[in-house]
Amino acid sequence: MTVEVGADENPDFAHDETDGAGDESDDEDAQGRDPELDLAVQYGDEIGDAQRKSLPKRKVIAEWLEPAIFSDTQFTVRFVGADEGRALNHSYRHKDYATNVLTFAYGEEPDGVTVADLVLCCPVVEKEAREQGKTLVAHYAHLLVHGALHAQGYDHERGEEDAAEMEALEIDILAKLGFPNPYR
């Protein structure tokens, strides 16, 4: 789910911590080099130390995102609890429930860098993984890839053709990462 947010509307958590820069992927951009991923990882107040330890680490998140980026990107991934997830979904989408992933796409910077925040609501992700019989790791990988594609303009809500294109990309990227088709 993508939320278009103008620069003056940045949520408080947007890009305040950078945890490294310049990870590389296997895809080359138009300039003949691999797209760069500048990645920050944050945790909401509801995420305790025990839960934080069970979440994917920055290096793993970067490994999952790299095949899903097609140009230089600056992403902040934020793991939140149900209250923050619900508040963000309500504020930006006018839906009064927490959802699995929200993508706050800020567009492309003048230098061509795609900037976005990917917010994952841990309790929702955990519940969905259990209900769908998926591993938690596979579900987090899928939702991060899904959010990254949204940040780059892919949108499954524009129609069946766009949904099919986005799903095919997700399936292909996840297969390259060693994960099963998330739609089965």
From Swiss-Prot:
Keyword ATP-binding present in the record's keywords: the answer is no
Q: Where in the cell is it found?
A: Cytoplasm
Report biased composition (Acidic residues) as residue ranges.
1-11, 19-29
The EC number(s) this enzyme carries? 3.1.-.-
Cofactor binding note: Binds 1 zinc ion.
Cofactor (UniProt)? Zn(2+)
Recorded hits in Pfam families, A to Z, give:
YbeY
**Role summary:** Single strand-specific metallo-endoribonuclease involved in late-stage 70S ribosome quality control and in maturation of the 3' terminus of the 16S rRNA.
Q: Which family does it belong to?
A: Belongs to the endoribonuclease YbeY family.
Full protein name: Endoribonuclease YbeY
Task: Report the source organism.
Answer: Burkholderia mallei (strain ATCC 23344)
Gene encoding the protein: ybeY
